Amino acid sequence: MLFRSERFTIIENKNNLIPFMQKATLGIFTFGVTVYEALYCGLPCIVMSHSKENDLYAKKLNEYNCMNYLGYYKSVKFTSIQKIVFDTINNQKLLKDLSNNGSKLIDGKGSYRASQAIKNIM
């Protein structure tokens, strides 16, 4: 853990973020596996991508209205992030919608489906 206050915690290099996600109101992430973990937990999240490839996948996932995608980090106006965070936290309907849409989308069975697809090819 890098920093903790009454209002927020900054976490870095944890092997298991699930316990933190289950207690959080909102997550702020770069796009990757952590976003999928947050969706599985029903944690609303604000997301940026750190590569052009991740930007493509994040845009596709954002079509499901399961996160607030800000875009590729070089295109994000960092001065606007504070307002986006406060607007999101203060919009209970948005938080609930993001949570519900995310948890419906990720069922935790993706690795099983992938292994079955590989098995069927063999």
Question: Where are the predicted features?
Answer:
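Acidic donor-binding loop of glycosyltransferase active sites
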Residues: 22-33
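C-terminal "capping" alpha-helix adjacent to the active site of nucleotide-linked donor transferases
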Residues: 69, 76-93
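Short acidic alpha-helix that forms the nucleotide-activated donor recognition element
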Residues: 12-24, 39-40
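Short, small-residue-biased leader/transition segments that mark boundaries at the very start
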Residues: 1-2
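Catalytic binding pocket for nucleotide-activated donors in carbohydrate/polymer assembly enzymes
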Residues: 40-79
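A short, well-ordered alpha-helix in the C-terminal region of glycosyltransferases
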Residues: 94-108
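Active-site donor-binding acidic/aromatic loop of nucleotide-activated sugar
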Residues: 6-13, 70
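C-terminal alpha-helical cap of glycosyltransferases
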Residues: 107-122
